[in-house]
Swiss-Prot record:
Entries under PROSITE patterns matching the protein: TPR, TPR_REGION
This protein's encoding gene: hemY
Extent of the signal sequence: none
Residue intervals passing through the bilayer: 5-27, 40-62
Highest taxon of the lineage: Bacteria
Alphabetical UniProt keywords: Cell inner membrane, Cell membrane, Membrane, Porphyrin biosynthesis, Repeat, TPR repeat, Transmembrane, Transmembrane helix
Name this protein carries in UniProt: Protein HemY
Organism: Escherichia coli (strain K12)
């Protein structure tokens, strides 16, 4: 606009001043090696004005041409973006249908023009993996990595997910270790870490992430408790595999008091020691647990114990009966322990006390065995009959 205004000013000046100097046009000589150009000052001014008009016209024409090209390019780019958006929407519908071949095709096609090309390539990689095409999955993943720039977390999460799908468990564990350094409370990273650590037996690492899982609300409390117990049992398995019962004892000794007072771990430790034929240590762990707090779970390994000092355990069981009252499982466990060293009369009394509180087919069978030893065949037969009737009642024929 300024240039046009200047041009009009010059033209007006020429119109006003021109007639004033019409009688005094002057003389201009432009001389070169081969040419001599002669004109008046007025003629030169007119030539310059015309040259400026021509230049402005050329500029205007070029601007229109380039503006048209830019509009054309914008139209083509917008068309590709609209197509990419439509294909992404179609791919999401195909994902809901489980048509992974179409998901990959639609997500990858025109992905560079999508609103979030990294997401398109990552979803295409997962769809290719679902089809078992690892080469295509890797290709899409690498393209996503190129476009992601510094925001590599989504790409690395997808990479770990693909590795787990391929059972490349140690590679996945390496990946989640690096991710946890960057984002230790990312819910999906924690879920993937859980899978990788379980598959590779990284039980200490699994224990380390459980507090972060609680803060990130990954899984409910019951699930996290199950994971914690699984991790501790995994560590027990490793200690037993390395050094047998001695390794188990040393490992247990090195744990914190809080850990050693967990009933579930006491039961698991006793069972591991029984499997190692270290019954005395297993019995001591059970006794220590019962003295601290009564829990039915501590009674479950007792029938498998084969110790040289069962009287100590039986004394503890009787004391528990006094402390917590008549409980059928306590009486039944005491009866089974008494049977191991021939205390048939005491065992029969214990089983009767258990059956008095609730019927149980196993207690009927054990009581019948004790009565046989006491030479009471008729009463033993009656107990077996009652046990059979209870079994049939609980498991009616189909």
């Amino acid at each position: 606009m300024l240039k046009v205004l200047l041009l009009f000013v010059l033209l007006i000046a020429g119109i006003v001043v021109g007639p004033m100097i019409a009688g005094h046009q002057g003389y201009v000589l432009i001389q070169t090696d081969n040419y001599n150009i002669e004109t008046s000052v007025t003629g030169l001014a007119i030539i310059l004005i015309l040259a400026m008009v021509v230049l402005f016209a050329i500029e205007w024409l070029l601007r229109r041409i380039f503006r048209t090209g830019a509009h054309t390019r914008g139209w083509f780019v917008g068309r590709k973006r609209r197509r990419a958006r439509k294909q992404t929407e179609q791919a999401l519908l195909k994902l809901a249908e489980g048509d992974y071949q179409q998901v990959e095709k639609l997500m990858a096609k025109n992905a560079d023009h999508a609103e979030q090309p990294v997401v398109n390539y990552l979803l295409a990689a997962e769809a290719a993996q679902q089809r078992g095409d690892e080469a295509r999955a890797n290709q899409h993943l690498e393209r996503a990595a190129e476009l992601a720039g510094n925001d590599t977390i989504p790409v690395e999460i997808t990479r770990v997910r693909l590795q787990l799908a391929r059972n490349e468990n140690h590679a996945a564990r390496h990946g989640v270790d690096k991710l946890l350094e960057v984002t230790p409370r990312h819910p999906e990273v924690l879920r993937l870490a859980e899978q990788a650590y379980i598959r590779t037996g990284a039980w200490s690492s699994l224990l380390d992430i459980i507090p972060s899982m609680a803060k990130a609300h990954v899984g409910d409390e019951e699930h996290r408790a199950m994971l914690e117990q699984q991790a501790w049992i995994g560590l027990m398995d490793q200690a037993r595999a390395d050094n047998g019962s001695e390794g188990l004892r040393n490992w247990w000794k090195n744990q914190s008091r809080k850990t050693r007072h967990q009933v579930a771990l006491q039961v698991a430790m006793a069972e591991h020691l029984i499997e190692c034929d270290d019954h005395d240590t297993a019995q001591q762990i059970i006794i220590d647990g019962l003295k601290r707090q009564y829990d039915d779970r501590l009674l479950l390994p007792i029938p498998r114990l084969k110790t040289n000092n069962p009287e100590q355990l039986e004394k503890v069981l009787r004391q528990q009966i006094k402390n917590v009252g008549d409980r059928p499982l306590l009486w039944s466990t005491l009866g089974q322990s008494l049977m191991k060293h021939g205390e048939w009369q005491e065992a029969s009394l214990a089983f009767r006390a258990a059956l008095k509180q609730r019927p149980d087919a196993y207690d009927y069978a054990w009581l019948a065995d004790a009565l046989d030893r006491l030479h009471k065949p008729e009463e033993a037969a009656a107990m077996r009959r009652d046990g059979l009737m209870l079994t049939l009642q609980n498991n009616p024929p189909q």
